[in-house]
Amino acid sequence: MTKAKNIEVTPELITNNEELSDFMHAANQGAASAQYILGVIYDTGVIVDQNYKEAVFWYLQAAKQRYKEAEFALGTMYAEGSGVMQSDVLALMWYYAADKNGYTKSRDQINIVAKRMAPEDIQRARVMSVQPLNCIKS
């Protein structure tokens, strides 16, 4: 499924193991949309057993390409501590990164997370969001 780079795909489009295999191939070839959708699949347990660490891995691969939905998803993973150690600073960093990349849905989450943080931590997250991948061990 080499078209994955050019189409918007949702997990519901993957209905069997053969399609999942094709999608995995596209993700391994660097298709950010396929990487993001694999993150969603592992995050939600669609077709495969739910695996938050695997979800984080695939979201991070897509985020390396500035895929805004993956940046937002990473914010949620850090906010909830799903597959990673919970961190409001890293959650806010990813939400800021997604917002800067045009994902306006991040703004609500920015407000929610920032309300429970100290001003200096909010500022740190804002600074880190300029180059979020430098702040994450992959």
List each model region and its residues.
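Short helix-capping/linker turns of helical repeat alpha-solenoids
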Residues: 28-32, 44-46, 51, 59, ...
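Hydrophobic face of amphipathic alpha-helices that form TPR/SEL1-like repeat modules
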Residues: 5-9, 35-44, 48, 73-80, ...
